[in-house]
Amino acid sequence: MRNSRRRLLAFVCGMVVSAATAFAAAPGADDSGAALWAGDAQRTMQWVMRHGDHGGRPFAIVDKKQARIHVFEPSGALVGATPVLIGLTRGDRDSVSSFVDRTVASLMPTERTTPAGRFDSEPGHNDKGEAIVWFDYDAALAIHRLRPAPAHERRPQRMASSDPAERRITYGCVVVPEAFYDDVIAPTLGRHRGVVYVLPDEGTSDAMSSSAEMALRAP
């Protein structure tokens, strides 16, 4: 899942401009019943559909600045959106290249990042047999349900917070509410291979560069 195309999208996503535009999604799209998107996620969705970059697969956009996920059908229809928990530390690069001889508990705070980029996702299971969606298997990064964690991390309270900064606590995985996983993730990314686009913490631009588009069209 680590390839030059994904790296290119990490760069491309880093150039997506923030915009003031927001609009309401379909009723029931998230916990509030009307998911408002920031411009970054909207522009990325439009770019994905314009170029067919998802290859006719379900896809998700993780907006790290807002600590939210938006999940789409292959047609581009929004299935749902919700606040998420993401990596403790801001950063857009892979902090850990492989978990060979490493454990999650061994990660330093500076290594607990959710990297930006384009990831080919696939359904799978963790070591406890729980259903998850891998988006970077080599780095042990997945989308999964909110699970029990040390009390001092206050994960349920952080998930409920309206402050995106409060929702930075994980080791790099994207953690969603249990009901959202069951109702939105499981029938889409949990059933089929897909694509996960993780938007960056840093970087702005007003358009996708022509060189990036040419590279995406290259064999």
How does the language model describe each region?
Residues 22-29:
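Boundary at the C-terminal end of the N-terminal hydrophobic targeting segment
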Residues 35-39, 56-59, 63, 171-175, ...:
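Soluble non-cytosolic domains of exported or imported proteins
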Residues 8-9:
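N-terminal export leaders
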Residues 40-58, 62-154:
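Gly/Pro-biased beta-strand-loop elements
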Residues 1-4:
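N-terminal secretory signal peptides that target proteins for export/translocation
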